[in-house]
């Protein structure tokens, strides 16, 4: 219902009084706000300072992440200020947690430059995270409108094209990370790549911190790695790859390394999250132009995603990276050595793989999201996984994933090739059991033991790592109220 002229006049008079007035009074709180299809929505977990009303704190977050400053400024009247103000429209207490609240905030699409993650983040996670009115602030989820998503390229290659290029269907991809991360010579590095691929893996990869150090310069690594790839591919008659990490100090250096990776025949290159959003988008544009798969290692994400009351949830990174245009991103294993609640991990994977997701509070998805035909990102599971967990990995993560066994390949007592073979046989036996309709989750250990009767490397792996697990309580789980209609 439209406001009367008198009401609008009164609000305008109050809203533009000189001096400092509450953010809620300035128009950054609107409990009756009607969400537009083109609005960008954000959900923040706020911990107000003692004595600060949660509605005022939410309005302050809306204001400081959009158009407000600490005092009323008359130049607001030169803009469409009532449109451009972000609106906090709902505040809910966080279930079972004292003094924390979920604040829902809507932003008009015109506040953001088209196709720019850097501009989006400058507002959403900018100065507002240092705001004194809140003790802690965490960005939990976002909804991107279709009109905004259409301004982004999306994944350079995408899952479907990658499967066609690799000629691998009906199962997860298998990979491994070269270990040790640092210190190998180029020749020894290439040998590790060859042995892993010869044993049956689809991919080997560089780790996040191998760039161009004195013990092995990047060009040497690229040449020896691709020698291993080509030799293993010719031997197996299959397409294989190695993620060549092109991360460097400048964009010029990264472009040079990426161009060289293309010249020596690589089908995939790799970057780290720490290079920044603009660099990631730039490399994604380069990758699509040059028909390359682009792998992203999430190095650095836990510095702001792991703590539950401050920073941002990794699902937001998943959304931004799908928009930015990467083809792979590390997204958790559930059973490995790194942080990962099963339901939350499922939410990450759905965010990367589904064309449309619904609200699912147990998975931490607070908004429905239509992905506007952006291609799918392949999640990567790595960190502390081994062949003995194959039934759990297939159950939790499904087919559309890269299973990366680093130590679980290179740590095999009989050598790298044997470690790769153990993982390949474990995966094939589990996929076969699933396709035959067997209860592969309940009977997984027995299926693996049966397969090991004709595969010595698998038997050795099961004997070595059978008791290895990482059963720690996750620090980041979904907060929701259990009800008979909960979306579980």
Swiss-Prot record:
Keyword tags: Calvin cycle, Carbon dioxide fixation, Chloroplast, Lyase, Magnesium, Metal-binding, Monooxygenase, Oxidoreductase, Photorespiration, Photosynthesis, Plastid
Cofactor(s) the protein requires to work: Mg(2+)
Annotated positions of the N6-carboxylysine modification: 205
Enzyme Commission number(s): 4.1.1.39
UniProt key word Chaperone: no
Cofactor binding remark: Binds 1 Mg(2+) ion per subunit.
GO molecular function: magnesium ion binding; monooxygenase activity; ribulose-bisphosphate carboxylase activity
GO biological process: reductive pentose-phosphate cycle
Protein family membership: Belongs to the RuBisCO large chain family. Type I subfamily.
Function summary: RuBisCO catalyzes two reactions: the carboxylation of D-ribulose 1,5-bisphosphate, the primary event in carbon dioxide fixation, as well as the oxidative fragmentation of the pentose substrate in the photorespiration process. Both reactions occur simultaneously and in competition at the same active site.
Designated name of the protein: Ribulose bisphosphate carboxylase large chain
Native source organism of the sequence: Pyropia suborbiculata
